């Protein structure tokens, strides 16, 4: 565990709360200035020297506040470059996993691409972006590498899995924020002479919402612990799939509890739920991770699965 996590989360919580609702051109410069991009870079290389649990804590806060700025992508990019011994260029560095779009690609000064055991760093002038938007209205651009890589190195990191973990971490915060909004609404909204929260059907729905949010929290924590241990492919596959299930169940509940107000652009809920629905598909959707997890489980067999689960849990918690 990082000794500076309390300081880190206090700083992130205050900054992200101040930036909630602010556009990219306001939010990103402040996020960059705070130095979050070097969260995983060792201290002797000029970074924070944090671990994946630190990353989880920060990404969770970003999701909680619906931060309109890339955070996971530059953190992962700087970590990969530091591990490869490649100097990171100035500005926003995003990532390109195989077959995936590039978050905030049009604003990036460089893109880190990992495929076939090779990491490549491309400057923006070697990239062509086909601009598009995510369901939350954020840049989600297709990239073509039309120029030569500025640097490259061998790399066996599963970039798609790291991106998937990042989305689970952010979703854990967004689900908490959506749950809080829903709780506040049903406690204050009066219908038929009493608060909505007094109705049994509402209570049951909110209990289910709470269960889904807790499941994503636990999945994200397991991923971070496994990443710090060094082997997280199983946990990430399970967590990304579980996140998809949670979004499928929790988002409709959040909107049912609010009624029409939840869909208005001025209200905070849709800024959370649109992100959640987009993150469900980014860095591999439900079908992709279900297949990857299923193949892994089938290969282990019944008794083998139990032994594997027990061993992984012992390594992470022990």
Where are these predicted regions, by residue range?
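Alpha-helical interface subdomain recognition
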Residues: 1-65, 165-318
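FAD-binding core of flavoproteins
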Residues: 66-75, 79-180, 184, 307-318
């Amino acid at each position: 565990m990082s000794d500076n996590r309390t300081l880190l989360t206090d700083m992130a919580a205050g900054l992200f709360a101040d930036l909630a609702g602010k556009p990219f051109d306001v939010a990103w410069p402040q996020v960059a200035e705070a130095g979050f991009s070097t969260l995983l870079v060792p201290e002797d290389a000029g970074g924070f020297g944090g671990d994946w649990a630190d990353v989880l804590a920060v990404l969770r806060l970003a999701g909680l506040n619906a931060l309109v700025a890339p955070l996971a992508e530059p953190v992962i990019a700087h970590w990969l470059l530091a591990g490869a011994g490649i100097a990171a260029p100035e500005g926003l560095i995003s990532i390109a996993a195989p077959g995936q779009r590039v978050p905030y690609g049009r604003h990036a000064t460089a893109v880190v691409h990992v495929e076939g055991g090779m990491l490549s760093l491309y400057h923006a002038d070697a990239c062509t972006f086909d601009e598009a938007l995510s369901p939350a209205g954020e840049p989600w651009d297709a990239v073509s590498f039309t120029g030569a890589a500025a640097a490259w190195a061998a790399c066996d990191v599963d970039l798609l899995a790291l991106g998937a973990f990042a989305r689970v971490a952010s979703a854990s915060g967004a689900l908490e924020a959506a749950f809080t909004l829903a709780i506040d609404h049903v406690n204050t909204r009066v219908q038929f002479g009493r608060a909505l929260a007094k109705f049994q059907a509402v209570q049951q729905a909110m209990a289910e919402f709470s269960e889904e949010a807790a499941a994503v929290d636990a999945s994200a924590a397991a991923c971070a612990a496994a990443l710090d241990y060094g082997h997280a492919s199983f946990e990430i596959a399970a967590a990304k799939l579980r996140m998809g299930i949670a979004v499928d169940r929790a988002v409709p509940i959040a909107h049912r509890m609010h009624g029409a107000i939840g869909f208005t652009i001025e209200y905070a809920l849709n800024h959370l739920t649109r992100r959640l629905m987009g993150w469900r598909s980014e860095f591999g959707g439900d079908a992709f991770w279900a297949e990857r997890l299923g193949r892994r489980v089938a290969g282990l067999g019944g008794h083998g699965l139990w032994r594997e689960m027990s061993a992984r849990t012992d390594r992470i918690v022990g």
